């Protein structure tokens, strides 16, 4: 199995199996890419067309993944990872899919993963969206954390889930970028992916969103410098799984969220 020469801008190096997967995929070595997964792996990918929050296309098992990749065929893309965090067998990352010929970003992607005991990929849940700009390294180039990002995220989620919209928006810097998957109601953020620039825009968007009877629950998180990656699930008020999401947050020098990007799918993909 060949390893990848893929570079990671921020955070941790990719696990060997994930680096090999991207390297093989980018090199159109599709059987080699499938070999990076465990026998019973869950491979959940965004649809080729439609809305980015649409249900994932789920394939189970290395053999079926190999068949799927063979049908997929070669693509003119390369993966560039802008932020990666790994803790034990769990991880999450954000990156860009770039055009192999021009080097220009074509889309942003995010993923969560769980590794098997032998280091192969046991669960891979991916998301894609239009390019989210700026990248984490541009939002805050410092390597020093001004606060504990997960605490600020919890503060934000609790306020949002309790419909305290000004308190939720106060967790963000005045010049924040907030990039969110398409809302069901286009009155909140328009059609397609929603981006709000600045706290005032974000506060107004939270009010348009209104009260929703859901609960955000974080199942993995890790911070590197001022940058955080997390995986979460959304439950309804009865505790049933509705959706899965990955979010990236970058703090400013005052410990407020200067950049927040999230990716979501419904229904959720259970963890192992």
Q: Where are each of the predicted segments found?
A:
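A structural signal for well-ordered alpha-helical scaffolds and beta->alpha junctions
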Residues: 18, 62-65, 153, 165, ...
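A beta-strand edge to alpha-helix "cap/lid" segment located at domain peripheries
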Residues: 2-9, 66-148, 203-272
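Aromatic side chains
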Residues: 21-22, 37, 43, 109, ...
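Short N-terminal micro-motifs specific to bacterial/archaeal maturation
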Residues: 8, 24, 55-56, 112, ...
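A solvent-exposed, acidic/Ser-Thr-rich amphipathic alpha-helical stretch
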Residues: 11, 30-89, 171-224
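Disordered low-complexity repeat/linker domains
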Residues: 29-30, 49, 121, 164-165, ...
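Short, low-complexity N-terminal intrinsically disordered segments enriched in polar/charged residues
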Residues: 1-35, 39, 131-170, 174
